[in-house]
């Protein structure tokens, strides 16, 4: 099996459409959605677009997918982490999805395992196999990698969540992040990955000015729309993003843990 991995779309339908054109040209067997799929300026249309692909799509739950379903149910609880969106943001998104969308998101698995050509068994999760909101960074200590994936047998793991692509060997396990389709850091365009027979980190360029304008038009009253559209036009630097996520990882770690 050869797959495309798309993570952190965050309701950016113009970016998704651009990536799907490249994915179609690549000729894959399946598309793995590695979490944080719909929340953002175009939540309903993004889910509808992906649903049109039918059984070709394999879905994995991200923290924002879980939070969006909870907001729809009226049970959302903020995490308190600076890098997670506030309740007002999820309330706006939840008002723009259907019951069927909610049921889809609420039923997504935390992890999926697939047999990939040339790589063997590969596990897919958004944060880690134990927590969809846990941050794995390219420079996280090896001890953090070991603990985060201890329950997995697969020698290769694909994660998302940090929006920054990397391919690292840690504690004998290959860990890959495809980056973000909808809200990348460090460069313009949309990041994703091809798996099989090896790993290729891909970037799709698209008209980010037109996309940002479309997002603003679709969601003028979405909390944080200025940040979201602005980041599509000119992405924050990877150094800025890494610093923010490193601080969040430090907040998440138990006292005396590896991220301290």
Q: What are these model-predicted stretches?
A:
Residues 2-102, 106:
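Core catalytic region of metal-dependent phosphoesterases/phosphodiesterases
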Residues 10-15, 39-42, 64-69, 132, ...:
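Active-site environment of divalent metal-dependent phosphoester hydrolases
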Residues 32, 58-60, 158, 174-176, ...:
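Hydrophobic/aromatic beta-strand patches that form the interior of the parallel beta-sheet core
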Residues 139-176:
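Anionic-ligand binding region
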Residues 169-260:
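Acidic, His/Gly-rich catalytic cores of divalent-metal-dependent hydrolytic chemistry
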């Amino acid at each position: 099996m050869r797959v495309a991995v798309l993570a952190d779309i965050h309701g950016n339908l113009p970016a998704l459409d651009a990536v799907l054109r490249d994915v179609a040209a690549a000729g894959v067997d399946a598309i793995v959605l590695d979490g944080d799929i719909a929340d953002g300026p175009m939540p309903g249309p993004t889910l509808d677009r992906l649903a049109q692909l039918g059984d070709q799509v394999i879905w994995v739950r991200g923290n924002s997918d879980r939070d969006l379903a909870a907001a729809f149910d009226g049970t959302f609880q903020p995490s308190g982490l600076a890098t997670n969106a506030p309740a007002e943001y999820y309330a706006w998104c939840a008002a723009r999805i259907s019951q069927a969308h909610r049921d889809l998101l609420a039923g997504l698995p935390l992890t999926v395992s697939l047999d990939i050509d040339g790589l063997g068994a590969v596990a897919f999760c958004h944060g880690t196999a134990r927590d969809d909101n846990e941050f794995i960074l390219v420079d996280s200590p090896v001890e953090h990698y070991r603990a985060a994936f201890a329950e997995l047998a697969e020698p290769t793991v694909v994660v998302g969540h940090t929006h920054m692509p990397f391919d690292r060997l840690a504690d004998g396990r290959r860990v890959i992040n495809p980056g973000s389709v909808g809200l990348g850091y460090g460069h313009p365009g949309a990041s994703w990955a091809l798996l099989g027979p090896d790993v290729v980190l891909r970037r799709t360029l698209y008209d980010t000015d037109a996309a940002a304008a479309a997002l603003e038009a679709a969601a003028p009253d979405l909390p944080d729309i200025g940040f979201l559209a602005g980041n599509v036009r000119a992405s924050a630097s990877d150094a800025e993003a890494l610093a923010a996520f490193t601080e969040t990882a430090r907040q998440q770690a138990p006292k005396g843990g590896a991220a301290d």
